[in-house]
Amino acid sequence: MLNKRGRSGKARISAIALLLAALLGGVLFSWPAGAAISKPRSTDAVNPLALSPESKKDLAAAARARLANDRLRRTGALTVTPAPVTKTVTAALAPQAGTSALVLYDNTGPYGQLGELYAMATANLAGHFGTVTAKPVSAYTAGMVNQYTATVYLGSTYYGGTVPDAVPAAFYQDAMATSRPVTWIGDNIWNMATAVGVLQFEQKYGWDPTNSYYESGGSLGDIDQVTYKNQQLTRNIPAGQDGGVLHPALLTGPGYPAVTTLAVAKDGTTGATSPWAIRSSNLTYLGEIPFAYVSESDRVIVFEDLLFDALAPATTERHRAFVRLEDISPKADPAQLRSIANYLKSQNIPYGINVIPVYKDPKGVYNNGVPETVTLAQAPAVVTELKNMLANGAVLMNHGYTHQYGTANNPYNGVTGDDFEFFRAHVDTADNVVLDGPPAEDSTVWAQGRITQALAGFAAAGLPKPALWTTPHYAASATDYRVLGQNYSARLERSLYFAGTLTGGTPDNSRYIGQFFPYSVKDVYGTTVLPENIGNYEPEAYNNHPPRLPADLIASAKANLAVRDGVASFFYHPYYPVTPLKQTIEGIKALGYTFVGPTALGQ
């Protein structure tokens, strides 16, 4: 329905929804006949969940099972069946060349599918540093930890009762014996202590996992903040989804080494604090897996930085920033483009321009019911502004072919910039955007066809081939992501990662994790992904989501200062005035960030 807004007196269609799967929806604007173009929906942002609806159900059930098992363990009533011992002779393993990470994950039990999602997220981050090997922990063989620079184990299955321990005794023993960094996240650290001897564990690490639990005072509490490097990071997990944070039982006195508290969790109701991440000897322990309900200022930042300690400890402090201009189509307003470009040039700020080469309004939503298609070649004034941008510090980026899907409402109206292109979606009765999966025709050939047509659109307008890609509304299939990697040097975006990817099976489009990064990574699709991690300017509240103003972007940039070599990367729609962009850039620069172009982000 139409309602009047104060901005220039123009009518605006109410925003319908944000993506409640891995990415968010946004706002759709309408202009009077004869105007250049509607303002697209601001949909390219990550949802605080970062898991698909099916994976959300898994998460809730796993949280309940964790709490039940933890209570049984506290009373001594939880029986843990050890993993079977495989009698094999292990040959000496040669270390991997260069920096390498071993990511071990759980994949057994009724919610074992969560383990692969978390492992992909971890492998992606570790891909910033070097090569990554990810495998189920059950496939671990003796001596493997010494083959890699560092090892990360993700304890997502709470072993006990009807779910036998899948962690081989060899891993427990090797994690204890090695001098190489081991990062343990979440469950089953108590089983390691039991396997190697509780006293021996205590004497090496200075704490007792067998006396550490998720509840304190009979409750998980209301942990809503994690402090790390003087940055207050958010932790916002709704009731019923929270599996808690382990409260480590630290030991003091003769015979126990000092334990370093790296990050501190705080209960928002009681004010009580406890360690969220600790380190002693070669072991770093995090009290929860931090990949669900993430935000731009989230506690996942702690893990993103701690990986430097394990994989690149000599890294020098460096903080860079990046801005890209979003959703520029052949129907963009040249004067608006020129205004933004002039400001960025005056500040000597390099930037990216995300361009959609073909505009389509197949049902005439913004053209009085008359279908409309406009190519870049048919928009010389827009192309002139794009060329001026390229001559003054901009880098051309490809933002889809049409940024919409046929004549379908996908999920809104079929118009370029508003709808998904490489994924199907609908709006449910609660005004949530739900991802339905890839289009029926999705394939390598189909995706390549759209890319080929997009590149032809740039060439026909006399523009160079874009080196970088950003997926419309940040959603595509695993097949599409691999095709994109064959056509562009990198993607600059947030992405979806589907169950089945690590195992080499058919991707499960109903189970995925969405992720964004504070630095460049080589992801599990084999593609370089450049960061966008602090979101975008959006001045109006919509879909129960508050406005995101310059102060919010700056606050997220401040939180990301905790990443020792991180980026504060955001995007801005050029139909908005220059002033909010100026405020955002000045605020980020005041934090000590240096703005760079997109190609520098991979360095």
Range-by-range predicted roles:
Residues D431-V521, Y576-L581:
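Catalytic domains of cell-wall/extracellular-matrix polysaccharide-remodeling enzymes
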Residues W190, V196, P350-S477, I534, ...:
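Metal-dependent polysaccharide deacetylase catalytic core of the NodB/CE4 family, i.e.
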Residues P110-N191, K363:
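Helical hinge/lid and interdomain linker segments adjacent to catalytic or ligand-binding clefts
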Residues T131-P136, L307-E317, A335, S339-P362, ...:
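C-terminal domain-boundary segment and adjacent tail
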